[in-house]
Amino acid sequence: MQSSASRCGRALVALLLACGLLGVWGEKRGFPPAQATPSLLGTKEVMTPPTKTSWTRGSNSSLMRSSAPAEVTKGGRVAGVPPRSFPPPCQRKIEINKTFKYINTIVSCLVFVLGIIGNSTLLRIIYKNKCMRNGPNILIASLALGDLLHIIIDIPINAYKLLAGDWPFGAEMCKLVPFIQKASVGITVLSLCALSIDRYRAVASWSRIKGIGVPKWTAVEIVLIWVVSVVLAVPEAIGFDVITSDYKGKPLRVCMLNPFQKTAFMQFYKTAKDWWLFSFYFCLPLAITAIFYTLMTCEMLRKKSGMQIALNDHLKQRREVAKTVFCLVLVFALCWLPLHLSRILKLTLYDQSNPQRCELLSFLLVLDYIGINMASLNSCINPIALYLVSKRFKNCFKSCLCCWCQTFEEKQSLEEKQSCLKFKANDHGYDNFRSSNKYSSS
């Protein structure tokens, strides 16, 4: 288990370094990260289309400006613009190279392929294998299904949007894409919270061994997770719209959060969106995991002396599941931290009227690019983390991916035998433990 955990840690460190190097390379080349890949959290800033142009990042209601150089009068002021309308523009021009677009498209294709293979295989393992249909695994399947919807619908559209520059899909798809993105993130967050609570309940009731099947409360949890996630994603569908502006004499359509919302609620949502995303979609799962894993550790230490030998194998399995859930939460935190950090730093440190803002803006662009790519990786990395950490999932992945040529009956029989073997052994040990207790009490 330690070797698997260390391999998982090394893989995550390598992923962080690779994304960091790619982001720094894009900054040196002058690529704009915020537009390179559409933000999964719905960034409010707007980039100019993928051509060589100057770029200025403004407030929440900033819109695109023409890339033509501003005419400066003898007094040093921009012609036709009041002195206090805009801050002095950044002197540095940001260029979008075709090489960058192709590299980002390749990364999106890799995420698309790995995400479909990994998440669909994970769903197949849990669906076909009766012994894998328990509470925690059903929650993991719900998480994988949400990631799969995001991968199938959003990633191809975002990659095409980068290559095309203009938004060609209409207002309906402009509302659907951020809606699915937000719903997918909500399903991930709430599923991780439910898994953390479930692990504490399992350890707190360590003497009760559950059989095969999905508890009714787990089914209710999954329904609530999907309903709440969909409801919380509705403001994205309401607020996003296709904004048409003039760019070099041609109309340019951009899918973005409309800076001019019609209702008071949507205006408040636009203003408080970044803080809401950071608190609910990032801090909440980390806080719940920290609280319930602390309680779980205290419970295990308190009952360690009273645990019976007959239950050791079953407790080891529960500890393995707890480590697996903790690894999923850790992967989520590492993948989403750079993007949330970029948003919070912009809200707290970035001042549009500061003449020295361009240096901070350059750093935020690099961090934003790293965060967007790592957030996309979170949709395909969960099956990989399960493969590295959990022995049961690792064996099931191997048998599922390496036995495609077998008949359906052979594959089903092999999966059931492999996964049910340990469960039957543990159940037999628990029966012996109960019979010994009855004998001693009589």
Swiss-Prot record:
The keyword Membrane applies. Residues 127-137, 198-218, 297-324, 390-442 are cytoplasmic. The modification Phosphotyrosine is found at residue 439. Glycans are attached at residues 60, 97. Keywords: Cell membrane, Disulfide bond, G-protein coupled receptor, Glycoprotein, Lipoprotein, Membrane, Palmitate, Phosphoprotein, Receptor, Signal, Transducer, Transmembrane, Transmembrane helix. Disulfide bonds join 174-255. It comes from the Eukaryota. It is found in: Cell membrane. This is Endothelin receptor type B. The lineage of its organism: Eukaryota, Metazoa, Chordata, Craniata, Vertebrata.
